[in-house]
Amino acid sequence: MTEINEKSLLKQALAEIKKKFGNESIMVLGEKPPIDTEVFSSGSMAIDMALGIGGFPKGRIVEIYGPESSGKTTISLHAIAEVQKQGGIAAFIDAEHSIDPQYAKNLGIDIDNLILSQPDSGEQALDIVDTLTKTKAIDLIVVDSVAALVPMAELQGEMKDQVIGAQARLMSKALRKITASLNKNGTTVIFINQIREKVGVIFGNPETTPGGRGLKFYASIRLDVRKIQQITSGNDITGHSVKIKVVKNKLAIPFKTALVEIVFAKGISKSAEIAQLGEELGILVRKGSWFAYKGENIAQGKVNLKLLLENNTKLFNEIKDQIIEKLKENQQQSQTL
């Protein structure tokens, strides 16, 4: 067979595939310029920076895991608020039956337009996710949490029964189905997960996450969320500082970290982020115990700086705009190197 005939047959085969499954089903990569990944903000500038692409990617699976009360749900709720701000539709699959509508409202979520499901089993939860992703109308689905996705076999069995690997099989099967429609329809699914300890592990990390290996494989991004210290006001504990590590990233450089402050009943502190990033980028200059902006001392100590930024919207937005400009400059410089 000549080279011309081979090329002709290949061309015919490609045309047939496109006719059957659509123009986007197959292509020669060099014919089409690379498409930038569409993203939406996480609601935190620090997390957006750590992700390397400016936010969570559309049409992908994201896993957020960590110990209890570390801020996983808060991060996910902030993402929902951002999607709604852009006019998108979000769904919250509350397998733990623990969502606090008032807290969600405090974080900026329009609860009147949030789709909520409290499923009775793991199969029901994942079937709902699969159905929603196929509608093309949902931008973000949050599943809270993988550990609470209990298979029917376990729910219907007796306490003494051991259903080994049932949840892992359920997750693996569901993820195969869900992934196929996610990218096509531009829906992002965030799975919140907990941490378990393997029994009998002496060497290495004993920590693992429920749901088997399927989620680790299918997730484009995995975030490890940990509390590092408490935030206090006098004798009262008002929140905690959280370290978020990007342990897997298929779209940018992994292993970057973000530090955020989560304040009880308020969520991620935007003023703390602006104070931190402003100092890191040289927009705010520390002079002893004072912080200076444009050569003028504006606040003594970090606490007073955060309070000033909270109460002075004009200053907050001015510094925020400069941070965004500085980050764009840094990104352009890194691309030219």
Swiss-Prot record:
Gene Ontology cellular-component annotations: cytosol
Protein name stated in the entry: Protein RecA
Subcellular location: Cytoplasm
Annotated organism of origin: Mesomycoplasma hyopneumoniae (strain J / ATCC 25934 / NCTC 10110) (Mycoplasma hyopneumoniae)
InterPro entries, per the entry: AAA+_ATPase, DNA_recomb/repair_RecA, P-loop_NTPase, RecA-like_C, RecA-like_N, RecA_ATP-bd, RecA_C_sf, RecA_monomer-monomer_interface
GO biological process, one term: SOS response
Gene: recA
A molecular function GO annotation: ATP binding
Bridged cysteine pairs (disulfide): none
Pfam families on file: RecA (PF00154), RecA_C (PF21096)
